[in-house]
Amino acid sequence: MWLFRLELKRILKSRRTLILLAIALLLSVAMAYLPISFEGINRPNKDGTVTELNGLAAIKYKQDLYKTSAGEVTPDRIKSALETYQSCVREYGPVEEEGFPLAVFIEKIVPFRHLLMGLPETFADPLTGIGADLMDIDPNDIDGAYYEKCAEHLQDVMRNEQRENETAQQKALEKYSELDTPFYLHSGISKDAFDYIEFYILFLAILCVAIAASTFAGEYQTGGDSILRTTKYGHKQLAITKILAAFTLFVVTFLVGITVHILILDAAFGTDCLKTSFQMRYSIINLPNINLGQLQIILVAAGLLSVLATVSCTLFLSAKCKDTLTVLLISIVVLLMPLFAYVAMGATWLSTILPSAGIGMQNNFLSQLADFNYLNIGGMSFWTPHVILISAGIELFVFTFLAIHSYCRHQVA
């Protein structure tokens, strides 16, 4: 234990480490503020004027509007909302046009528009997947079989996207059949809030990699390794201690930073909206059987696993290479490779099995949860979020073992 404390103290004495940790905490606050600042709405006043609300004021005003639509998403409520929408459009014209009265939009459209979110998808063209216009949907077609119709749309989507893989189609339908219905809606929190959780995890991963790069390679450069090698605990035990100290620092930093980040978001947007079903914030045919509060927990857990897997790869490179700069450059390439692979080739094994596969932008874990990507091998199909988690878990242990092994072999050499 004393060796562990000494190693942790050594890491924290580095000015570079302290600066990077401070940046991590500052980013936690700054990146939580951004999606809050993006919120905006125009409020009509009794005297006919309009007040533009932004930030917390806009969020509070929207929360008051959304209260009337909170609850279970039943076919009857969707039908009623659609009838109201169509009635307003027939009387005042398209909602998107400038001539649509703001007072009517705020009173009759805004509170219920999220109830209508899934209708264009549900009634989409089965061949092209193009969503239906809300004015073309007959309210009488929204009946007790609404959720069965959603499942039919998922079947059409999977048939188009996984045409040659019936196993993937079947697995998606089976997963969708396990969802708890009717869905629940309490509007309030934006997609941006969840996107910025993922962005923050990406920046945390970069900062952790920057700190971890010098764990072993830094001592190779200074020659300190030659001195430590002559001590009683300068072999395997020292390698394990260094890795444990690094992991402890990164876990604490990650949890503190992400907790502060999420607490700021939840304080601003409220916690009632976290009861909303995943499908009511993203796509009506999404597969995860979770609400937005559970989504936050899953993103944190998956992000921590991916960060640790990426750091373990960096520690292996640090034990293998002779200078910190080389380690850092290779580690950054490995960290960003899934992002570029996904942009270039879409969902492939390369973009999902690397340690940082769940970290990034289009390729991040949230995007995979909201998508319908399946990887196929032989007659088997695997949903990409499962592949990412399993791969990261395996790589965490494999790269940690390789880091210890490489450090010991370096000593023998």
Set out the residue ranges of the language-model regions.
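Aromatic- and glycine-rich beta-strand/loop motifs that create alpha-glucan
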Residues: M1-L18
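Cytoplasmic juxtamembrane regions at transmembrane-helix boundaries
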Residues: T230, T314-L335, C408-A413
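Alpha-helical transmembrane segments of multi-pass membrane transporters/translocases
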Residues: T17, S306-T314, D371-A413
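Short helix-to-coil transition segments within interhelical loops
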Residues: R229-H235
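Short hydrophobic, aromatic-rich alpha-helical segments embedded in or entering the lipid bilayer
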Residues: W349-N373
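Secretory targeting signals
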Residues: L26-V89, D138-E219, I240-K320, N364-F365, ...
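Residue-level recognition of transmembrane alpha-helices
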Residues: L21-A24, K242, S331
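Transmembrane helix segments
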Residues: Y33-L34, C321-A357
